[in-house]
């Protein structure tokens, strides 16, 4: 009787272990993370005839952002922008605050607005640019997706007492070519490039007066 009970328990344990191993084998592997860069093309200094903004340094500080826009996960929202979520496995290569700082530095260097554009501290004359990310979203809507970028800029003169020269907000929305995240990253890059061009154009106009 004891032998039969032992054999039954052993058979039950073997069946249970087989079921556990079978279920483990059927589990889907965890999704891997995918990383995205911004791709922004700046005009070269030779493409434009502009008056330099300053003969001194322009410092671009790290952008400000709040909540989800400080994190690396790509943000998406509904059409009304009331519900904001994150693509947990689709990430920017760096935080949006730092990415936009570096992209704006490269953009301004290419346009020739100053002899030196940097993120370094400036103690002399020149300008400081402060940016804020208001929106940088993939927007889900009926029939497709679009992107919306909202950025605010302040241009501050560092000659003598710091003085605000310009404060302006910009927004750009556009429809994406598809629902893949690589297409969203491309569309966000194009929207940011458009906003950078608007900001630079507004400052050019300010100094051309």
Language-model regions, residue ranges each:
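Short secondary-structure boundary motifs at beta->alpha junctions and helix caps
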Residues: 81-91, 160-198
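Generic short beta-strand segments
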Residues: 63, 132-136, 171-173
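Surface-exposed short loop/turn segments
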Residues: 25-47, 53, 110-161, 177
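A structural "domain/chain start" motif
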Residues: 24-96, 206-209
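Sec-exported extracytoplasmic/periplasmic mature domains
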Residues: 105, 109-113, 200-208
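Sec-dependent bacterial lipoprotein signal peptides
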Residues: 1-22
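Extracytoplasmic/secreted envelope proteins and their assembly/folding machinery
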Residues: 97, 101-105, 189-192, 196, ...
């Amino acid at each position: 009787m004891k032998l039969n009970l032992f054999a039954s328990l052993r058979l039950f344990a073997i069946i249970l272990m087989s079921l556990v191993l079978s279920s483990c084998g059927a589990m889907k592997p965890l999704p891997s993370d995918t990383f995205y860069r911004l791709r922004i093309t700046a005009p070269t200094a030779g493409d434009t005839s502009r008056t330099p903004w300053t003969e001194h340094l322009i410092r671009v500080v790290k952008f400000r952002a709040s909540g989800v826009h400080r994190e690396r996960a790509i943000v998406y929202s509904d059409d009304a922008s009331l519900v904001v979520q994150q693509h947990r496995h689709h990430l920017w290569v760096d935080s949006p605050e730092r990415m936009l700082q570096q992209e704006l530095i490269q953009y301004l260097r290419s346009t020739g607005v100053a002899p030196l554009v940097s993120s370094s501290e400036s103690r002399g004359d020149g300008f400081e640019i402060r940016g804020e990310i208001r929106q940088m979203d993939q927007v889900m809507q009926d029939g497709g997706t679009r992107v919306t970028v909202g950025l605010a800029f302040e241009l501050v003169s560092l000659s003598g007492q710091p003085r605000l020269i310009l404060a302006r907000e910009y927004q750009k929305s556009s429809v994406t070519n598809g629902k893949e995240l690589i297409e969203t990253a491309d569309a966000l890059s194009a929207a940011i490039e458009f906003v950078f061009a608007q900001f630079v154009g507004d400052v050019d106009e300010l100094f051309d007066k």
